[in-house]
Design a protein with these regions (language model features):
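Extended, compositionally biased alpha-helical segments that mediate assembly or anchoring
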Residues: 1-58, 257-344
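Short glycine-rich, low-complexity/disordered patches
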Residues: 24, 57-64, 164-181, 217-219
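Mature, Sec-exported extracytoplasmic domains of Gram-positive
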Residues: 28, 154, 179-201, 305-307, ...
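Assembly/oligomerization interface modules of large self-assembling protein complexes
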Residues: 44-130
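Long, contiguous amphipathic alpha-helices that act as assembly "spine/axial" helices in icosahedral shell
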Residues: 114-183, 315-322
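Extended oligomerization regions of viral-like shell subunits
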Residues: 196-302
């Protein structure tokens, strides 16, 4: 038990929670519990520490994934949001003092709705995140002033769990669907398992990165003339093993991946997530995308509570609903090839 407590205390200090340590007095109280109660309590403490680690990862100022989450609740979400982004060959409307933005948007939708709809792939998603707080058990082990903070921390885990779900499930599932349906440009034949392969891939990524900023039809699957005008719209998505292999020192001049990371524009996929294969049977290694190619739009993010008096517990849940999807006319490239292996 002492080793477990020491580990939890060290984890909390590492995460910046220096004032929340398991004290000698608390240990004496815990020792009075049954072994089953001790393990239940330690498991809850571990979950809190784990979620604090996730919250550090999901810092709004550092986390690139936050750019992909948009609010669809307050303003609504319609096809017009993308209609005005990429309309190829639209005849400019003559605007006079009485021609409103709403009229212009309506005319554009009317004229080009069918073409754009066929290249939009969106569907709703719903997910519920539950947790149970057993107040009666926790009161045995915490001073009153600490109990409230502990329970609040456990409830706020739900928000972090939802963000992890959105990144590791919704985002990755969309990428896999884009690959399967060839809704993304696939650059194949790459390897990061030898020096020539790394250099070739870096040069290709750099060329495409620059190309995103030019009006052309090379980088989206529908071959629409498109442009990614600002650096902060260009994102890279990969696994850490691929990223570390690509940024080895001798090739750092080919493309400054570290600068992209510092600017918060690299999203890391968990190593144990299966990205599937391309239609040609290759492994996806790296993605370069305009953030507008993917949509995760939140329509509802609502917490609920239900108290169960005869069991001294409160059930909390977070309901998340939204729209997820992608399109075929915004720049997005997948680089595929051999999976990462031991360096040759």
């Amino acid at each position: 038990m002492e080793d477990y407590i020491a580990l939890l205390n060290e984890a909390n200090k590492y995460l910046g929670f220096f004032n929340e340590q398991i004290t000698t007095e608390t240990i004496e109280v815990i020792q009075g519990l049954s072994e089953q109660q001790q393990m239940a309590l330690f498991n809850q403490m571990y979950l809190v520490a784990e979620q604090r680690g996730h919250e550090n990862i999901f810092d709004a100022e550092k986390n690139a994934f936050r750019a992909f989450i948009i609010d669809a609740g307050d303003f609504g979400w319609t096809i017009q949001d993308y209609m005005l982004e990429v309309l190829e060959g639209v005849t400019p409307q003559w605007v006079d003092g009485e021609y409103t933005d709403e009229q212009q948007a309506e005319n554009l939708v009317k004229d080009y709705e069918q073409k754009v709809k066929s290249n939009l792939h969106y569907k709703p998603f719903r997910k519920q995140f539950p947790t149970t707080v057993r107040d009666y058990e926790y009161r045995k082990s915490f001073y009153p002033s600490k109990l409230g903070a502990f329970i609040d921390r456990k409830i706020t885990m739900l928000n972090t769990s939802a963000e992890i779900y959105l990144q590791n499930s919704v985002l990755i599932d969309e990428l896999k669907e884009m690959i399967t349906n060839r809704h993304i440009v696939i650059s194949s034949g790459h390897t990061v398992n030898n020096s020539n392969g790394i250099l070739t891939l870096l040069e290709q990524v750099k060329s495409d990165y620059i190309g995103f900023g030019q009006p052309n039809s090379k980088y989206n699957s529908d071959r629409v003339i498109s442009i990614t005008p600002y650096d902060d719209l260009k994102y890279m998505i990969t696994k850490a093993s691929t990223y570390e292999r690509m940024k080895v020192r001798e090739y750092s001049g080919a493309f400054n991946l570290d600068q992209m990371k510092l600017e918060g524009r690299i999203i890391f996929i968990p190593e144990d997530y299966d990205m599937g294969t391309t239609p040609d049977g290759e492994t996806p290694l790296f993605f370069l995308i305009d953030r507008r190619a993917l949509v995760i739009a939140i329509k509802m993010w609502k917490m609920g509570t239900f108290y169960v008096p005869n069991q001294y517990k409160t059930n909390h849940w977070l309901g998340v609903e939204g729209i997820r999807g992608h399109n075929e006319f915004i720049n997005a490239v997948c680089y595929s090839g051999e999976p990462v292996s031991v360096f040759q």
